[in-house]
Amino acid sequence: MGTDELRAAAGLFARLLAADAIPWRGVLGGVRITEEDTTSSSRIFLKVMFQEMAEQLGVRVLGRRMNDDDESEVRDALFPGDNAENTRFAINFFTAIGLGGVTEPARRMLSLL
């Protein structure tokens, strides 16, 4: 899949997730944002998807949804707490794509690891 196709697919998922047309847990519950679990292509996909979701929902709402206790599977997958390196990678990923505001709970968790 080329970059244009990745962007189109990510945009579709962003719109569906932002509209709650598909379940966050079902889509994002298995997405671990770590160096080992992602590739450059998957990071492009995730970057576009989360940036478009932020445009549609706003960063605050997106952050609340990603870190919601009712969606703990999503939070725990996106911000793995198994070790500091994985947590830091996820925080750095979101910060690098301009969404550092969604990382505050993960930053607090990192200080406890």
Where is each model-derived feature located?
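Eukaryotic alpha-helical solenoid repeat scaffolds
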Residues: 1-113
